[in-house]
């Protein structure tokens, strides 16, 4: 007892049962299961087991070597033959004084041989000698033959003989001047950035090497102006990743996704969905919070006119019946439009496009999965005809891919009834309005949804100004507006050609058995989309020739129509380029889900662009604003290329002639009780709206240098002369047997 503690006993520290049992055991001496396993592995490593040779690889007792052993030795490339003991005067004379300098693949000297006439130290000769040594009935002889063909194609690639043995293949630059009258689509120059490798199945593991010169080109130091789209796309991609990881649990597909009919009987559904995982994209439920956020993002986006646009609704937007006062208000302020006419144009545009589609979808309770399957089936229908995809089923009868003309157009008459899905006629006949379906955009993941929303809003605003400012019965186009619309028609056609061609190649790349073939270098390389619009040097030069023109700059100064179409072009150009770059980035790591989403996003934008060219092509008629002896003009070859492009895009959108568009518009105006009036409105209806200038305008493309020495655009020609070969663009009658002529 301690007196200081008032007689209370001292509390000692409690000891564990382990310490009581083993009082002298150190805690550090305890070993876990992992330590025990490591110790066992270390003991096994100290006693390595001697590898015994296989009995079938043993050398026969009466021979010094075994021929079977040599065969497998050559296949593995482990031959111990020397490479410097063959001293023939012929080979020594060909070596020259600089023998040994540089890469061994750059010399033209024959391969060095091993002593005693052995095989050269290269895989090709080793495979050939192995094939010679094997009997015809050997089970693996066919495997060696296929491997030898692959090695031969890799070691001896085709080159341009006129430019030297080390010169790369020269790529043809494309001109947008069109082709001679009466020659058809077959005489059109080849697409830009494409050489003789359109059907090249050689493996190309580094596709950016062919475009390395673009990084060294000082004229492309800044690359294509993507403005704020890159940052927005990066933020959307990060947000979607976080949502998938922490917010939304993975769900099973809502419905069973069928195989497109164009591929039935040619590929198993499991194999198709492994390459194009549409079932993974169909997992988003219709009432998901992401759909609500997508709808809110559309409603909160700014517009050039400042009004809220009704996109996906079964209710007509508000408007005033009566006179529709088309034409710009006269005054000192530029870029004005009547507010009454703008709201009437919203109702007119809604009825012409998205209104009928939205009501049909709502009435039939159609899920967005059908629209997704429609896009995939129609885009894959053309690509399924490529030799890259059908080579597995038709070995030995491989025909060359279309390396000339407009890509898709080279085989457009081969498949017109492609991949039928329910309501396909409705989707094709809505002027590309699928892009305004919020649930469909959400299915395409974050970045494609953002790009589709951006491009769709730009094209919608441009059409609104076109319908609000002009009418065929009261056109009133000024000279500046006619020139600007002609320039935009040329640029939009060139952009649509490039987008459709990309869809053609990207679909074959997704579905084909050779994803690393040189033929798909265009869609796999990342450098072109970092430096050029849509990865096209021809489109870059066409933009430079158009935007830097003094007449075009004068039109931008005062015309609201020229400004809003410029913003629409920049929006489509930026969104499409970003999606193509996304596809190339995901193709490098073979992320097929994101590749499919980017592919369908480009298809959605291309469908909307082709549908928007119909009202924009009102310029093609003599009724579109002739004042006195003046007549609209258009670039030579533009209408011919547009006609060819309309045939190529038949699976996605149904082309509409001018007469058909006028009749549909006039019928809708009668239903809405609207009447076009060329005079200014009376007092009380004279409220005007001014176009809000944006940083995403066509002026951001000013000040660049062309890449080619020759112009890519043709001269301006009379619209009547250009329509001489294509009267079906106005009347819709007289479809011809050749591509682009009806």
From Swiss-Prot:
Family matches, as InterPro entries: Herpes_UL47 (IPR005029)
Placement of sequence motif Nuclear localization signal: 10-30
Positions of short motif Nuclear export signal: 95-122, 485-495
Main location class: virion
Subcellular location: Virion tegument; Host nucleus; Host cytoplasm
One GO CC annotation: host cell cytoplasm
UniProt-annotated stretches for the region Disordered: 1-128, 155-199
Ranges in coiled-coil conformation: none
Keywords annotated in UniProt: Host cytoplasm, Host nucleus, Late protein, Transcription, Transcription regulation, Virion, Virion tegument
PTM annotation: Phosphorylated by US3. This phosphorylation is required for proper nuclear localization.
Compositional bias per record (Basic and acidic residues), positions renumbered to this chain: 1-10, 38-62
Acidic residues composition-biased segments: 63-88
Leftover remarks: Expressed in late in the infection.
The protein's role, per its UniProt record: Tegument protein that can bind to various RNA transcripts. Plays a role in the attenuation of selective viral and cellular mRNA degradation by modulating the activity of host shutoff RNase UL41/VHS. Also plays a role in the primary envelopment of virions in the perinuclear space, probably by interacting with two nuclear egress proteins UL31 and UL34.
Entry comment, domain topic: The nuclear export signal is CRM1-dependent.
Subunit architecture: Interacts with US3 kinase. Interacts with UL31 and UL34; these interactions seem important for efficient virion nuclear egress. Interacts with UL41/VHS.
Record-given protein name: Tegument protein UL47
């Amino acid at each position: 007892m301690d007196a200081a503690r008032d007689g209370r006993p001292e509390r000692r520290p409690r000891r564990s049962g382990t310490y009581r049992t083993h009082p002298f055991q150190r805690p550090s001496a305890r070993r876990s299961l992992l330590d025990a396993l490591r110790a066992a592995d270390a003991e096994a490593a100290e006693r390595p087991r001697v590898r015994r040779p296989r009995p079938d690889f043993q050398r026969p007792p009466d021979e010094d070597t075994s021929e079977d052993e040599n065969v497998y030795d050559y296949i593995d490339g482990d031959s111990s033959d020397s490479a410097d003991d063959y001293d023939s005067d012929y080979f020594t004379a060909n070596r020259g004084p600089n023998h040994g300098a540089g890469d061994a693949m750059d010399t033209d000297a024959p391969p060095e041989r091993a002593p005693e006439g052995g095989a050269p130290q290269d895989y090709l000769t080793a495979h050939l000698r192995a094939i010679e040594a094997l009997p015809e009935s050997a089970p693996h002889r066919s495997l060696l033959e296929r491997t030898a063909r692959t090695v031969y194609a890799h070691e001896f690639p085709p080159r341009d003989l006129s430019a030297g043995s080390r010169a790369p293949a020269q790529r043809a630059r494309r001109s947008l001047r069109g082709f001679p009258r009466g020659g058809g689509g077959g005489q059109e120059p080849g697409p830009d950035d494409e050489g003789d490798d359109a059907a090249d199945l050689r493996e190309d593991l580094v596709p950016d090497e062919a475009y390395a010169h673009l990084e060294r080109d000082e004229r492309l130091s800044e690359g294509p102006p993507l403005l704020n789209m890159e940052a927005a796309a990066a933020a959307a991609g990060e947000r979607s990743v976080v949502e998938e990881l922490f917010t939304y649990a993975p769900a099973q597909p809502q419905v069973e996704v069928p195989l497109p009919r164009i591929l039935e009987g040619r590929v198993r559904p499991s194999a198709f969905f492994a390459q194009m995982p549409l079932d993974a994209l169909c997992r988003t439920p219709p009432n998901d919070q992401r759909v609500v956020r997508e709808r809110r993002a559309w409603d909160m986006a700014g517009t050039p006119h400042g009004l809220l646009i009704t996109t996906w609704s079964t209710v007509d937007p508000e408007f005033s019946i009566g006179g529709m006062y088309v034409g710009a208000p006269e005054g000192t302020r530029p870029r004005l439009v009547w507010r009454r006419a703008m709201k009437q144009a919203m109702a007119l545009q809604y009825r012409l496009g998205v209104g009928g589609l939205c009501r049909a979808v709502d009435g039939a309770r159609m899920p967005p999965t059908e629209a997704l399957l429609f896009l995939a089936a129609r885009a894959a229908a053309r690509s399924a005809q490529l030799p890259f995809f059908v080579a597995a089923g038709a070995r030995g009868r491989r025909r060359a891919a279309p390396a000339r003309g407009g890509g898709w157009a080279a085989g457009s008459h081969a498949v017109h009834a492609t991949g039928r899905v329910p309501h396909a006629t409705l989707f094709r006949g809505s002027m590309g309005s699928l892009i305004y379906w919020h649930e469909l955009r959400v299915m395409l993941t974050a970045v494609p949804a953002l790009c589709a929303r951006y491009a769709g809003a730009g094209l919608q605003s441009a059409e609104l100004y076109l319908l609000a400012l002009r009418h065929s019965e009261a056109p009133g186009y000024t000279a500046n507006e006619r020139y600007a619309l002609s320039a935009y028609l040329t640029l939009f056609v060139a952009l649509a050609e490039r987008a459709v061609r990309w869809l053609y190649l990207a679909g074959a790349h997704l579905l084909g058995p050779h994803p690393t073939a040189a033929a798909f270098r265009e869609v796999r390389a990342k450098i072109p989309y970092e430096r050029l619009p849509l990865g096209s040097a021809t489109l870059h030069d066409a933009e430079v020739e158009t935007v830097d023109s003094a007449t075009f700059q004068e039109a931008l100064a005062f015309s609201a129509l020229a400004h809003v179409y410029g913003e629409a072009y920049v929006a489509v150009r930026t969104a499409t380029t970003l999606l193509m770059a996304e596809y190339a980035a995901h193709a490098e790591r073979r992320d097929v889900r994101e590749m499919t989403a980017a592919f369908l996003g480009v298809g959605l934008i291309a469908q909307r662009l082709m549908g928007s060219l119909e009202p924009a092509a009102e310029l093609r008629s003599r009724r579109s604003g002739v004042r006195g002896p003046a007549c609209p003009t258009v670039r030579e070859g533009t209408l011919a290329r547009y006609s060819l492009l309309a045939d190529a895009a038949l699976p996605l959108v149904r082309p509409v002639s001018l007469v058909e568009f006028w009749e549909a518009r006039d019928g809708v105006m009668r239903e809405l009780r609207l009447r076009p009036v060329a005079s200014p409105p009376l007092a009380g209806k004279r409220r005007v709206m001014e176009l809000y200038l944006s940083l995403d305008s066509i002026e951001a493309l000013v000040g660049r240098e062309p890449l080619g020495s020759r112009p890519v655009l043709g001269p301006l020609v009379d619209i009547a002369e250009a329509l001489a070969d294509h009267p079906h663009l106005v009347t819709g009658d007289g479809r011809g047997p050749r591509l682009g002529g009806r």
